[in-house]
UniProtKB/Swiss-Prot annotation:
CDD domains for the chain: MFS_MdfA_MDR_like
Family: Belongs to the major facilitator superfamily. DHA1 family. MdtL (TC 2.A.1.2.22) subfamily.
Keywords: Cell inner membrane, Cell membrane, Membrane, Transmembrane, Transmembrane helix, Transport
Gene3D superfamilies: Multidrug resistance protein D
Pfam families in UniProt: MFS_1
Topological category with respect to the lipid bilayer: Multi-pass membrane protein
GO CC annotation: plasma membrane
NCBIfam families reported for this sequence: PRK10473.1
Organism: Salmonella paratyphi B (strain ATCC BAA-1250 / SPB7)
Localization, UniProt: Cell inner membrane
Annotated protein name in UniProt: Multidrug resistance protein MdtL
Transmembrane segments: 4-24, 42-62, 69-89, 93-113, 131-151, 158-178, 217-237, 247-267, 271-291, 295-315, 328-350, 355-377
GO molecular function, one term: transmembrane transporter activity
Length: 395
């Protein structure tokens, strides 16, 4: 079991590392490529577009051909794309490399969740996904620090050499450590109960959890996107204060994420999901009424705690009905989360909604919709029948 957890964690970490590690080198990258920092900030959107593109195909391929081939190819693409970014001499080539990095990271991300669905029951899966969420919260804190240390002695290209090395390590883990977990053919007596056709993506329970996780990701990405404006422009923080504040909020996320597995031993998953949405609602109300920086910071802290306590549980429930189509389900969740959050941020920008109101709106909207879905759509017998661990060791 340890090999699956190690490989899943490594596969997921490519996604946040690809976002956060290069940011510290952005001014030098812009200078060397004769582009403005504003022009290169589109690299974030390009990276997410690459992830979404990969997710369109990676899940189905993983269900048909196996998790291991997709993981190996994804890591290889990430590694080669990182090298392409390091060799870029102008902006368009750099953005092409960023898109391909997203493709590689997206494929690995989908496979990681499919592997966990294949190998863990619902209770253990919720705990592991909460831990995974805590680990991914470490990356936005550590990656810029590592990047800064690298750039003290080496040029910005070294950041992408480092990411390329990460791709190589993940590829080697996938090749030599990871075992195939894709479900084998079912016996004829099981086909009517568990078949790809029976595991529909349009069942009410999956759609409800897809909506909850998409709204939750929209909350956290809106927070990340709006935080520079809120903290430095509205609240008057310096860059140093901003970095410290974001590190502290990431610390809150880590503590809550690592505590959630223990909470799952005491409370039902539904209870933790309601607590999560209650924290979002409280954060929205707090931010709307805040008149001091201290109260605003308290509201922002509630956002991180709310996301960390509920997201892993909701993701685990969303994957539960899919013993044979975990790859497709994981892809669908990933695409909805990336596209849904991007759509909200884009619409809010087009409508001229301020950063604070953008955040308050998604917090209150997410909490109300999610609480209604949690109460109105509960796991039924059909979902329970598919909640099985299909993995069996292969020679």
């Amino acid at each position: 079991m340890k090999r699956f957890l190690l490989c899943s964690f490594a596969l997921v970490l490519l996604y946040p590392a690809g976002i956060d590690m290069y940011l510290v080198g952005l001014p030098r990258i812009a200078a060397d490529l004769n582009a403005s920092e504003a022009q290169l900030h589109i690299a974030f959107s390009v990276y997410l577009a690459g992830m979404a593109t990969a997710m369109l195909f990676a899940g189905k391929i993983a269900d048909q051909s196996g998790r291991k081939p997709v993981a190996i190819v994804g890591a290889l693409v990430f590694m080669m794309a990182s090298l392409l970014c390091s060799r870029a001499s102008e902006g368009s080539l750099f953005l092409s490399g960023r898109f391909l990095q997203g493709v590689g990271a997206g494929g690995c991300y989908v496979v990681a969740f499919a592997i966990l669905r294949d190998t863990l029951d619902e209770h253990r899966r919720a705990k592991v996904l909460s831990l995974l969420n805590g680990i991914t919260c470490i990356v936005p804190v550590l990656a810029p620090v590592v990047g800064h240390l690298i750039m003290l002695r080496f040029p910005w290209q070294s950041l992408f050499y480092t990411m390329s090395a990460m791709g190589i390590i993940v590829g080697l883990l996938s090749l030599f450590i990871l075992r195939e977990t894709r479900p084998a053919r079912l016996a004829p007596r099981d086909l009517s109960r568990s078949s790809p056709a029976a595991e529909s993506l349009v069942n009410r329970f999956f759609v409800s959890r897809l909506a909850i996780t998409t709204l939750s990701v929209s909350v956290i990405l809106t927070f990340v996107n709006a935080s520079p404006v809120l903290l430095m422009e509205v609240m008057g923080f310096s860059r140093g204060d901003y970095a410290i504040t974001m590190a502290l909020t990431a610390g809150v996320s880590m503590v809550v994420s690592f505590s959630t597995p223990f909470a799952l031993g005491l409370f039902k998953p539904r209870t933790l999901m309601l607590v999560s949405q209650g924290l979002f609602l409280t954060a929205g109300v707090t931010l709307s009424l805040a008149h001091t920086n201290t109260v605003t910071l308290f509201g922002l802290t509630l956002i991180c705690a709310g996301f960390s306590v509920g997201f892993g549980v909701a993701m685990s429930q969303a994957l539960g009905p899919f013993s044979l189509r975990a790859g497709v389900a994981s892809s669908t969740l990933g695409i909805a989360q990336v596209c849904g959050s991007s759509l909200w941020i884009w619409l809010a920008a087009i409508l001229g909604i301020s950063a604070m109101n953008m955040l308050i709106g998604i917090l209150i909207g997410c909490s109300i919709v999610s609480i209604l879905l949690i109460f109105s759509v509960t796991p039924n017998r059909s979902v329970a029948e598919h909640e099985e661990i299909p993995y069996q060791s292969r020679p």
